[in-house]
Amino acid sequence: FTFNNPLKNFYFKYIKRQNPYSEIAVNDLLMKFKENIKIIKGDTNKILKELNLQNIEYIFIDGGHNYNTVKNDLFYSKKFISENGIILCDDYDLSYAPGVKQAIDEFVKENNCKFELILDRFAKIEL
């Protein structure tokens, strides 16, 4: 079940006059939660190994769609996540990017994680 809010589309098209998925719109939304969110922008294959993060309770991955990138993202997420943390991955079962599903399935199996598919799109991984 997917809910589409027509008021959201009207608001962004005629009042805000911006794409609701643009970087500006997303940053405006996330600023409401700035005490709890840290946005890190860049190529995860390069920046994740440079970060010093720990005890992150929730990680949302919406990144590259190739196998090696997803493996890298999950490898570092495991290092950063707290005990009983949750990793949510977007685009789990894309027909044109089978490496995403393969990397996630391998990670879940290798790390004995709980797995839940949400809305046929998101992979919820509990460590």
Please provide the spans of the model-predicted regions.
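S-adenosylmethionine/decaboxylated-SAM
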Residues: F1-L127
